[in-house]
Structure formats: structure tokens, C-alpha cells
Amino acid sequence: MTTAVPRLIEQFEHGLDAPICLTWELTYACNLACVHCLSSSGKRDPGELSTRQCQDIIDELERMQVFYVNIGGGEPTVRPDFWELVDYATAHHVGVKFSTNGVRINPEVAARLAASDCVDVQISLDGATAEVNDAVRGAGSFAMAVRALENLAAAGFADAKISVVVTRHNVGQLDDFAALADRYGATLRITRLRPSGRGADVWEELHPTAAQQVALYDWLVAKGERVLTGDSFFHLAPLGSSGALAGLNMCGAGRVVCLIDPVGDVYACPFAIHDRFLAGNVLTDGGFDQVWKNAPLFRQLREPQSAGACGSCGHYDSCRGGCMAAKFFTGLPLDGPDPECVQGYGAPALAQERHAPRPRVDHSRGSRE
């Protein structure tokens, strides 16, 4: 590791003038009801930001020189002004990456996307077969996602992403996912299952076993050179030598990443939609720039963090204690071990009596909110 890398990580830990990765959930409306949805999406929130309010945020992002925004939901393409907002963002030098289940990616839309140099598309797929995928994402969702990939490939869209949430039921399909990506000229992106949103209700039964975590690490080291992971799997880093696993080995919440939700609330992390991690609101707290730079929560997160119960572990520098959201939503202390700690410290903590907080909002169809 060069000396530049530790300096860069130190800079990340103290926060940047603008987020590297800004996730923006434009809507909670969704045509699917995935059992592990991190935002408990389904129904549109009546307080959803207007088109003009969204454009004001984009204007701020341009002034802050944010490179791109990662748009999700819900299913963002069902919002009536989605394409208007995409065009507005790219015209104002803010690139767009959006996540979709593929419902609106018909041949005409695929051709439109292929003609743009500023838009990246990520198709969600949680099984390399319909049987595995549809068990968590709903009947017909596999065929819908594959049809979107086919349309993008036929239109000449370069380098779509296939985004996979790794579960104990699909971790054995990693080679199949990679083959699927190759078939459509796409790049594979895999992410960690967090106990966030509806994921809190199914985490115990869906998260990979300890043996599968090791198998996942081995696969990433052996075959993951062209696989995107972001900061999803830094909790696996203690399984090998320093630098063996690509990606950022730290929690970027409030430092280099954050989330704007459909009503303008700003959270430290896309997987931590709870009052504990609410930094402010773009409408009532002076705009996004003001929240990002001055919110007390973000200032706190950018201070040196205590290693807590993990301080005596020789692997702390590798994983930094793991994922904040995973700990919080399983009822574990934030300065304790990750629930999936590969050194085995998470399992005893999970076995103790604990209170797991519930997500702040639930827009699932059938919920009362």
C-alpha cells in the first residue's frame, strides 16, 4: 500500500466538502414488494419533493461539484417527472446513476439511455435464476429484469450494472451472476444484505452463514477483480492480508456518503433510515450544502471514533468494527462488533437479550403510514 492511500483514508474519515456517493431516493412508490427492501418502499409519500424542489437540490449539487448522484427508491422510474429530473441533472453537470427493477426499460427507453454519456443504469437482480430471485423480489421480477438487460444490450448501452444483494440463497450463484453480466456486456455489482427497512424482518433467515461469508471472501479475492463492491464487505477484511479485498475498508456514513429521502430528509447512510441518523432536512435546515457541512450529527461522525469493545482485537484496523447500520438494527452497540464479525465476536453479542430498533418510516403497501 502506498503512503498516499492512508492519507486518502484519513481525509475520508474527517469528511469531504461534498459526498463522493450521494444516494437520493426520489420516491417510495414501487411496483414490487421485495422482502428485504432497505427503505420499506411501496406507497408514495404525500410529502414527496416537487419537481422544482428537486431541481433546487440539483442546482446545489452542481455548485458543490458533486460528480454524480445515485438515484433509487422505491422504483424511481415510476415518478412522472423522473426523466425530466435526469435531463436537468445531466444538463447541470451532475451525472446520474439510477437503480431500477427494469419495469420501464423498454426498447425506446433503452435507446434513449444509450444515447447519453452521463447516465448509468443499475438493474436489481437477487437470483441468477427465477426461482431464487422471485422468492425475494416477487413473481415475474426475474423475467422483467432480464428483459431490461436485453433491451439495453440491443440498444448498445455500454456497461450496465447488475446489482445483487448477497443472501444465503444466492451466494452459491456468484459465478452464474458473473456469466449473466458477461452475456449482456454488463458489470456485476454485489452488496451486503443489511437489516434495514423490511430487511430487518428477514435478516436472520437471509444473511449468509459464517461459512458462506468465508466462501464469499475467497470468491472476491479469486474472481472479484472486475466486480464492484463499494464499501459493502469491509467486515470481511480480517479474513486475509491487508489490501487483499478491494474497496473502502471503513464506514463512510456522514463522511463521504449520505442519503436524501423523498421528503428531503438527509440521513448519514442509505441503510440507516432512523431518527438516530437523521442529520436534517433540505427544506427546513438551509439546504443540502448546509446540512452536509454543518449538521451536528455529521460533525460528530467526522470526529475520531472509539474502537470500543473492538479495541483489543488485532484486526480492528482492517474492518473498523464493521457496519454501523448492521449493528444498530440488530440491537448491538455502535462501538461493538459487527453482527457478522468474521472473528466470531458478533455471534455471542447476538445471542444476548437485545432491543432491535425499527426503521423510522414504513411505506410498505398495507402499512398504516
Swiss-Prot record:
Its EC number is 4.1.99.26, 1.3.98.7. Keywords: 4Fe-4S, Iron, Iron-sulfur, Lyase, Metal-binding, Oxidoreductase, S-adenosyl-L-methionine. It comes from the Bacteria. Gene3D superfamilies: Aldolase class I (3.20.20.70). SMART domains: Elp3 (SM00729). Residues 347-369 are annotated as: Disordered. Its cofactor is [4Fe-4S] cluster. One of its GO terms (molecular function) is metal ion binding. [4Fe-4S] cluster 2 binds at residues 251, 258, 269, 323. Binds 3 [4Fe-4S] clusters. One cluster is coordinated with 3 cysteines and an exchangeable S-adenosyl-L-methionine. All three [Fe-S] clusters are required for MftC modification of MftA. Residues 16-232 form the Radical SAM core domain. Pfam families: Radical_SAM (PF04055), SPASM (PF13186). Residues 352-369 have a biased composition (Basic and acidic residues). Interacts with MftB. This is Mycofactocin maturase MftC.
